[in-house]
């Protein structure tokens, strides 16, 4: 397992900041906290580290400015609050970072900007250019146009997508909790704190609880989801409390936090994009033999597919699901859903006779696939990743 190292030894760090850290429901923006955070960022920049910030708080800040009532907001109220809050939030970051002679650049993303390949590449190029000129990208979901059907829904997973998009080697999720426990600590006083998580297993996933604040849409569940996206792409992750001033300095000085080890070596940019897809277009349900073959680094053949779910087109990202019902991989499918159903369970040599044209032998080729669950030993997986990168 890759060992934990000080923040100063990472090359590129994505920092996600929760709404409750930045905004007080009554008092508004926590300016002193933001100034201390920006001083921490300035310290990292002075060491030559690229820093990106995924900042929640637009809706919460706009809500405070507009004096909207507590409780759930209607969609149009959330979008209006975001429109007001985004201006105030960007100005606050710009002013605070400027004290360290750092330029901030605002980027508002929608789900399509990371899920559609061409837009993904455009967004990545813009972010990389900002980093190249020494700026700090301040990234948030564009809540003024996002709807419940087309949104990330939380900035934890958005931050993980940004980390994989930009090739970051560390993702730091700052929240109102100091890390992962075996059970929600506010419900179970006997919950045990986990300092190091070598891999995200079903047992780890089961430990996740819900959101703790009306100002936040995320919770431990979304942080674990973010961890799966980030660590699969070779990016370590830290969950830490941001309640203290200068939380990054606190982490460096030994404050309690949970560290998630990257699950392997970083894969190619194409595979990174595949691994981080938030909404697969469908699913391929496979048998035990296929699971073993995929674990050995082989392609998914039609013979190992038991059933098909969803409607998808050739080239879409699909989830590959094992007999236990758990996703084990993601990949770009070689057939649309209708043809995939027709050849599922059949030998590759039969494809032309069934479909009337000579298709690809693999339902999902190994070069278009990323494992998202642990199969086999970690050393074996790392060798395969390196061989196919």
UniProtKB/Swiss-Prot annotation:
Record's keyword annotation contains Ribonucleoprotein: no
Localization of this protein: Cytoplasm
This protein's UniProt keywords: Amino-acid biosynthesis, ATP-binding, Cytoplasm, Kinase, Nucleotide-binding, Proline biosynthesis, Transferase
GO cellular component, one term: cytosol
Catalytic activity field: L-glutamate + ATP = L-glutamyl 5-phosphate + ADP
Domain spans labelled PUA: 281-358
GO process annotations (BP): L-proline biosynthetic process
Protein name: Glutamate 5-kinase
Lineage, highest ranks first: Bacteria, Pseudomonadati, Pseudomonadota, Alphaproteobacteria, Hyphomicrobiales
């Amino acid at each position: 397992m890759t060992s934990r190292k000080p923040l100063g030894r990472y090359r590129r760090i994505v920092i996600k900041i929760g709404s409750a850290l930045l905004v007080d429901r009554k008092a508004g923006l926590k300016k002193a906290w933001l100034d201390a955070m920006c001083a921490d960022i300035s310290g990292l920049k002075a060491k030559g580290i690229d820093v990106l910030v995924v900042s929640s708080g637009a809706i919460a800040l706009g809500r405070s400015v507009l004096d909207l009532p507590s409780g759930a907001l209607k969609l149009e109220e959330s979008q209006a609050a975001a429109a007001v809050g985004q201006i105030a939030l960007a100005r606050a970051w710009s002013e605070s970072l400027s004290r360290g002679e750092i330029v901030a650049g605002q980027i508002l993303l929608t789900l399509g900007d990371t899920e559609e390949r061409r837009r993904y590449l455009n967004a990545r190029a813009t972010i990389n250019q900002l980093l190249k000129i020494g700026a700090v990208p301040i990234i948030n979901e564009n809540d003024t146009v996002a709807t419940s059907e087309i949104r990330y829904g939380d900035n934890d997973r958005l931050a993980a997508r940004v980390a994989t998009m930009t090739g970051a080697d560390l993702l730091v999720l700052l929240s109102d909790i100091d890390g992962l426990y075996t059970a929600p600590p506010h419900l179970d006083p006997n919950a045990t704190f986990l300092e190091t998580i070598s891999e995200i297993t079903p047992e780890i996933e089961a430990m996740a609880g819900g959101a703790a604040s009306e100002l936040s849409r995320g919770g431990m569940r979304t942080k674990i989801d973010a961890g799966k996206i980030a660590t699969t792409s070779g990016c370590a992750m830290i969950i830490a409390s941001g309640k203290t001033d200068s939380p990054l300095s606190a982490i460096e000085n030994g404050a309690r936090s949970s560290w998630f080890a990257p699950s392997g070596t970083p894969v190619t940019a194409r595979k990174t994009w595949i691994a981080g897809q938030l909404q697969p277009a469908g699913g391929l349900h496979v048998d035990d033999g296929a699971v073993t073959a995929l674990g050995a680094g082989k392609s998914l053949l039609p013979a190992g597919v038991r059933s098909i779910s969803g409607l998808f087109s050739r080239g879409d990202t699909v989830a590959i699901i094992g007999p236990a019902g758990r996703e084990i991989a993601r990949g770009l499918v070689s057939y649309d859903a209708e043809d995939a159903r027709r050849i599922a369970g059949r030998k590759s040599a039969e494809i032309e006779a069934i479909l009337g044209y000579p298709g690809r032998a693999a339902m999902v080729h190994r070069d278009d696939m990323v494992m998202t669950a642990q199969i086999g030993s970690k050393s074996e997986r790392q060798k395969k990743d390196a061989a196919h990168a």
